[in-house]
Amino acid sequence: MTDRPCTPTLDRVTLPVDIKGLTDRELRSLADELRAETISAVSVTGGHLGAGLGVVELTVALHAIFDAPRDKIIWDVGHQCYPHKILTGRRDRIRTLRQGGGLSGFTKRSESPYDCFGAGHSSTSISAAVGFAAAREMGGDTGDAVAVIGDGSMSAGMAFEALNHGGHLKNRVIVILNDNEMSIAPPVGALSSYLSRLYAGAPFQDFKAAAKGALGLLPEPFQEGARRAKEMLKSVTVGGTLFEELGFSYVGPIDGHDLDQLLPVLRTVKQRAHAPVLIHVITKKGRGYAPAEAARDRGHATNKFNVLTGAQVKPVSNAPSYTKVFAQSLIKEAEVDERICAVTAAMPDGTGLNLFGERFPKRTFDVGIAEQHAVTFSAALAAGGMRPFCAIYSTFLQRGYDQIVHDVAIQRLPVRFAIDRAGLVGADGATHAGSFDVAFLSNLPGIVVMAAADEAELVHMVATAAAHDEGPIAFRYPRGDGVGVEMPVKGVPLQIGRGRVVSEGTRIALLSFGTRLAEVQVAAEALAARGISPTVADARFAKPLDRDLILQLAAHHEALITIEEGAIGGFGSHVAQLLAEAGVFDRGFRYRSMVLPDTFIDHNSAEVMYATAGLNAADIERKALETLGVEVLARRA
């Protein structure tokens, strides 16, 4: 860690209005200081560093030219919003990023009027901008609508759906394509810079004419470069021709780190555009901080780190992460079954499929930010005789739900869904919480839904999924490390729809689904100290339920409590349905279901979030005492 940077220009800026009086030279100083402040802040909190560093100059230019919050600046995904937050009245809290009670790591409407539209998932910004522009034309909020979207987010179909609609409506809307992957060769780059300056100096309606006429004005060595640039833009998917066919005037590419290019182009668009415009800027993720630029993911997400060295502060763990256990287990299964393949939607590292891809590159598919396509692609792989594992975060699987129903479940195709980040995920907060998958999957006919209680169970569930060819099967597991149990040498397929009793007891049964089992066992020990010895069981399956186990627990106990890391409508609701149909409640049987509360829980550590949700050991103990009518002890618990 180091002391905070010296930021004399940034110290003069509290809100975007303070930027308006700065000279272009001062804006360049502001950008340098903003980059240093962003690095310093994230070194304290951890977070998504690289994306923000890549848009520092763009952020300064946008707030210098546009009039937020009247003008709506919409940041796609939100990973890149830290510099924006510093310039919009939140610098004094920037070192609370992603901390409990602190700033969100994404844009959030309830946090600031400058966050006009919340984010967390990708590829939504253009739709929002088109919507804001339509509202303006119908008499709603005035001001421009500006979407800032990365080239990665452009791999999602939703972005092009929005471009198509925006071009059709023909309302003034500005899309800035933040391209941090392409590189333009020097001759072409020089040409692009020159043409961009010509564009900025001409009336907007004459942009195309200026571009055509510019060729003859260029120095002779540049003319061939100009022709090559024109052909290149026609041949690649991000070229201007595609966007113009969709109804957007195309400007660029320009250097997104050069304020001498950004400022005049944005000024011209602000002053003269009357219809949809797309500005293509080239940036570098992690710009200005060598450790981030050198990182494989260019500093996408980091823990706390030392500013001087870039060395991250990582907690020591005695157990492997669930993600790594999944990846290693899948590799073992694939070594003996050539039909096993893996599909991810732009998250190979996050899902562990980068490890699988290193071992089996021809059996690994990264489809981009396209969960809908990932699911249907996996369905066809299964129909074609393969055994696909579709590994997607719980929160992102929501984006492919229709395909799960229509293309997988109805056709009973054996797609294996590996659902990472199940339950509450900590610092990323509500947008990334895996709260709903059990509820929206378990109501589908013919699907198998499992949840691993620990890392050893996950190994067996990977083996179970690999061996299951009778229809779709899903297994969920959380973010973070396992609990440190002894690991099996090899996964053994579980009997479908069969749970297990962990420990025998009397009076009350605690039936866990997922990794709350560790907390359930702590609660059971506390209850035993009070003279109440509960039975503890691991359901393993939410669909199909272990009817025999559940009905036996009901028959031999006064009460049953289910515990899960999911929303209302999931495992506990299915257990209640079973008990009701079996007439168990007719004899006065006591049943309680502990689930995530019916609210979106703000970011914090996962431990604090589960305490807020009422799903830690003390809460389980208290619920057991209340259910048994031990009110005095329950109040003390």
Swiss-Prot record:
The coenzyme or cofactor needed here is: Mg(2+); thiamine diphosphate
**How is the cofactor bound, as the UniProt entry phrases it?**
Binds 1 Mg(2+) ion per subunit.
Positions contributing to thiamine diphosphate binding: H79, G120, H121, S122, G152, S153, N180, Y289, E371
Pathway stated in the Swiss-Prot or TrEMBL entry: Metabolic intermediate biosynthesis; 1-deoxy-D-xylulose 5-phosphate biosynthesis; 1-deoxy-D-xylulose 5-phosphate from D-glyceraldehyde 3-phosphate and pyruvate: step 1/1
Q: Which PROSITE patterns match?
A: TRANSKETOLASE_1, TRANSKETOLASE_2
Q: Which domain of life does the UniProt lineage start with?
A: Bacteria
Q: Name one Pfam family in it.
A: DXP_synthase_N
Q: Which SMART domains match?
A: Transket_pyr
Question: What EC designation does it have?
Answer: 2.2.1.7
* Alphabetically ordered keywords of this record: Isoprene biosynthesis, Magnesium, Metal-binding, Thiamine biosynthesis, Thiamine pyrophosphate, Transferase
Q: Which InterPro entries does the UniProt entry name for this protein? A: Dxylulose-5-P_synthase, THDP-binding, Transketo_C/PFOR_II, Transketolase-like_Pyr-bd, Transketolase_BS, Transketolase_C, Transketolase_CS
What are this entry's molecular-function GO terms? 1-deoxy-D-xylulose-5-phosphate synthase activity; magnesium ion binding; thiamine pyrophosphate binding
Q: Which GO terms describe its biological process?
A: 1-deoxy-D-xylulose 5-phosphate biosynthetic process; glyceraldehyde-3-phosphate metabolic process; terpenoid biosynthetic process; thiamine biosynthetic process
User: Record-annotated residues binding Mg(2+)?
Assistant: D151, N180
Instruction: Report whether Metal-binding shows up as a keyword of the record.
Output: yes
As its record notes, the protein acts as a catalyst of: D-glyceraldehyde 3-phosphate + pyruvate + H(+) = 1-deoxy-D-xylulose 5-phosphate + CO2
Role this protein plays: Catalyzes the acyloin condensation reaction between C atoms 2 and 3 of pyruvate and glyceraldehyde 3-phosphate to yield 1-deoxy-D-xylulose-5-phosphate (DXP).
The entry assigns this protein to a family as follows: Belongs to the transketolase family. DXPS subfamily.
Instruction: Relate the assembly described in the record.
Output: Homodimer.
The protein's name: 1-deoxy-D-xylulose-5-phosphate synthase 2
Q: Which organism is it from?
A: Cereibacter sphaeroides (strain ATCC 17023 / DSM 158 / JCM 6121 / CCUG 31486 / LMG 2827 / NBRC 12203 / NCIMB 8253 / ATH 2.4.1.)
